[in-house]
């Protein structure tokens, strides 16, 4: 089989692709590795277009290039340079008024807008940049032009090499999103390579076949397949599924930050025990799901979470026996943009809602345990609440949405009916919950599609630097870390962060 690997993703993501490439090369596959060669000049790692980051990235590629077996051939995008095409692309005029317009932008029938927006938002966490400011538009236009040129080069190399399968990181960010679209257009098999930290901090690599890792239907099918594996007993599946939820509620590490760390058990809002019914809203980090794809956009009833929360508060404003509590996601506590700061003002606008800030020590799990209804926007607190036999109303895309464990209204009218129904019961589907828990618990321990990613971390001038297997300069990891540290201090282009008023 002929595999085409795109290492054009910057540090540290290229390390995931390199390890995966080595794995398949040792199986005897014919491997073509595509390196950027400093040709594009902008990616998630280098949004400020710092030429020294490009230099270090190229050095990084050359390290693992020298260690690859003979059946791995490297091709550089720089070798495909076409100045005439680049000059032609730079003349393209993009017409957009909002970031939602940018999502829809295509080049030669290939969407480049989602990759642009996803990468920008991942870097800045700004969901609404002021594209009317001239220098903001110049920055975004330049990024879009680079993505057009990158797409041109990607198609050119795929057409030339005619691979059976292509590999790239994640599928969401700018270097890879167009590859998803190209693969679909050409009916070509593709693999999204993803990294994950499992229990105990072990870094591993997971592959997602012909789907992005965020695809809800695909992930549901994986959960069903894991559950249907007859090599594992039903008893063990149930034990592992229950263990996942038990560990989560006890603050055990599951690959992401521990967002309940520092929260105080039994600490609750002052008005918690006033005899009213308690409906608790857990919002999510809206920026994390903002530009994954149209699948998530279509799942939403409301354009923004704050619109949804206001709708809920207004719907229940005259039900004096119901108190609303909004727990702002801890990951938003340092965000200065209005999609977070406006949430903090909701108690001034609606008398029936108590806002609990992201940095509050109030216990999220105690809020969940004492709630009569839980409303979520796709967060894992939704499935955890369902496991605790709570009524859960989910208003966004979620990996548990198609497991039939939460109420998933499709319209505002559906939502109103769920909010005002005093006889609503929790959905009784323990097996669906255990499928979810077993999937993630098994992946964390014994998943056969995982293989380890070698890395260590060092402290340098109070900064933690992750050093992977191929992070070396002149054979030295320390020298790589030192150069990386000082390059990060160098200023490239200013990344615009102004929010539209």
Residue ranges with predicted function:
Residues 29-148, 195-259, 455-461, 470-501:
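Conserved N-terminal ligand/cofactor-binding loop architecture of enzyme catalytic domains
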Residues 248-344:
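Conserved catalytic-core segment of nucleotide-activated headgroup transferases in glycan assembly
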Residues 11-28, 32-33, 180, 301-317:
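Histidine-anchored nucleotide/phosphate-binding helix
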Residues 341-358:
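Nucleotide-activated donor-binding/catalytic signature segment of Leloir-type glycosyltransferases, i.e.
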Residues 150-206:
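Conserved nucleotide-sugar donor-interacting segment of glycosyltransferase catalytic cores
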Residues 360-407:
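A donor-sugar binding/catalytic signature common to diverse glycosyltransferases
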Residues 275, 405, 409-501:
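Long, C-terminal catalytic modules of enzymes
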Residues 7-17, 168, 289-293:
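A short, glycine/small-residue-rich beta-strand->loop->alpha-helix junction that serves as a flexible
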